[in-house]
């Protein structure tokens, strides 16, 4: 009798159901896709997603030990091609590997956004080159290199930093004074000096500073590799280390840094990769709603 019972339990464990879903089979460069795993039994350990030789841990959805998700960034400079996505998980110490294909396609980003600024903001002096490099290193140390392994959003959907007209989309190729220098790493909102800016979700302020290009900027950690940041601000109403709630006033818009006029530059980094913040918001909120 004991042997029969043991065999029954073993058979149930071996044939447990695991469903894996990808949000996209075709995905634009500069955006984000999601992987969701659902199991009818507790896994031996948290599953992982392997993409382009990088391992991304999957995290529980709302604390459930049977539902996991991961958001994976597609670098803006990714080539148009098929890529492998591997999901690994353990059941009864058996390592299972599942492979999927996604196709990277080029987004319909604007290719000739012309911007005129002072010459010194395009061709930097040695002093400003040193300054810019030092600023980047500070941000990398305090923001880009960090991954908080738990959810700071408290399972809350993202909102927008303000209600205003979008004047420049993520991904646009930017031509400064006649030369293509970069692509737009965020979304610009029309905002006169002094317009209120709100945190797009719960999180922790990890850095506030003045940067050569971005001017006054706030970085907020939302956990699990996601950081939002708000640039060209006039003033800060929060400080480093402070917890903020979604919709909380964090400061006002300004005209600091390399700009042609006052506005808010809103951006998001996921695992140290800039992604379209509005597409990420839409996807994050959709996954949160579908897998409650």
What are these regions (language model features)?
Residues 196-206, 235-253:
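Short, well-structured beta-strand-loop connectors
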Residues 109-141, 145, 239-248, 267-292:
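Acidic, glycine-rich catalytic/binding loops that coordinate metals and/or anionic ligands
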Residues 3-14:
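Sec-dependent N-terminal signal peptides
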Residues 99-214:
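Surface-exposed, glycine-biased beta-strand/turn segments
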Residues 38, 210, 248-249, 255:
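Short, surface-exposed secondary-structure boundary micro-motifs
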Residues 185, 200-234, 262, 267:
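Zn2+-dependent peptidoglycan hydrolase active-site motif and core
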């Amino acid at each position: 009798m004991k042997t029969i019972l043991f065999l029954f339990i073993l058979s149930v464990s071996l044939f447990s159901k695991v469903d894996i879903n990808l949000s996209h089979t075709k995905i634009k460069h500069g955006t984000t896709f999601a992987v969701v795993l659902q199991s009818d039994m507790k896994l031996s350990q948290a599953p992982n997603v392997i993409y382009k030789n990088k391992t991304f841990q999957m995290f529980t959805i709302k604390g459930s030990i049977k539902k996991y998700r991961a958001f994976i960034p597609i670098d803006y400079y990714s080539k148009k091609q098929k890529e492998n996505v591997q999901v690994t998980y353990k059941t009864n110490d058996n390592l299972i590997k599942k492979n999927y294909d996604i196709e990277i396609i080029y987004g319909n980003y604007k290719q000739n956004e012309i911007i005129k600024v002072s010459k010194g903001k395009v061709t930097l002096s040695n002093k400003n080159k040193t300054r810019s490099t030092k600023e980047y290193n500070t941000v990398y140390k305090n923001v880009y290199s960090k991954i908080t392994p738990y959810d700071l959003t408290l399972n809350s959907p993202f909102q927008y930093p303000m209600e205003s007209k979008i004047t420049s989309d993520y991904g646009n190729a930017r031509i400064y004074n006649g030369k293509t220098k970069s692509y737009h790493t965020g979304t610009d909102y029309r905002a006169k000096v002094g317009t209120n800016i709100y945190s797009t979700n719960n999180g922790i302020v990890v850095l506030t500073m003045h940067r050569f290009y971005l001017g006054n900027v706030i970085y907020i950690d939302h956990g699990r590799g996601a950081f939002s940041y708000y640039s060209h601000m006039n003033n800060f109403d929060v400080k480093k280390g402070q917890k903020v709630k979604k919709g909380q006033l964090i400061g006002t818009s300004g005209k600091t840094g390399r700009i042609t006029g006052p506005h808010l530059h809103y951006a998001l980094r996921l695992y140290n990769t800039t992604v379209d913040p509005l597409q990420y918001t839409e996807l994050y909120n959709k996954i949160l709603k579908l897998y409650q």
